[in-house]
Amino acid sequence: ADILEIGVPFSDPVADGPVIQNASYQAIQKGTTLTKIFDMVEGVRKEKCEVPIVFMMYYNTVYHYGLDAFVARCIECGVDGLIIPDLPFEEQSELKTVLAKNEASPILIQLVSPVSKQRVPMLLENARGFVYCVSQMGVTGKGANFHKDIREYLAAVNRPVQFR
């Protein structure tokens, strides 16, 4: 695999469709916690897995854990990137400040959507690692109804971004 994305379950996954909502609910009911996920990642890294690991999660989970403690634990166990769909670019400064304190911090992955044409240059300029391209609007898991201008959108976004 080129990358491993781990979806961190959340108690109120409003941006997700029924499948991911149910998966989050089931995971939480069975005792999955962020601490256990960190421990799992640490175990994977001890097995010499070098595939980049990225967390897909809601910002509330990060905030509740504590920004400094969260970033420190990401570094400690080997999390390479963070995809946080409910954290818009304009509200990333607090987390970015904590991430900037250590070169080993995970990369904050920028999300670009088909309706953000004016924002694409700014988002790409601030992107590190890769860009997460949202291909359909609304909640996740609602079928394969891609945005009508998907080809043009992907062509506009498809350019090299700076790696850390």
Give the location of each predicted region.
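Active-site cofactor/substrate anionic-group-binding motifs, chiefly glycine-
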Residues: A1-V8, S24-L34
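Short glycine/proline- and charge-enriched loop/turn segments
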Residues: P18-A27, C133
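Short beta-strand/loop segments at the ligand-binding rim of alpha/beta enzyme cores
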Residues: K48-Y58, L99-L111, N158-R164
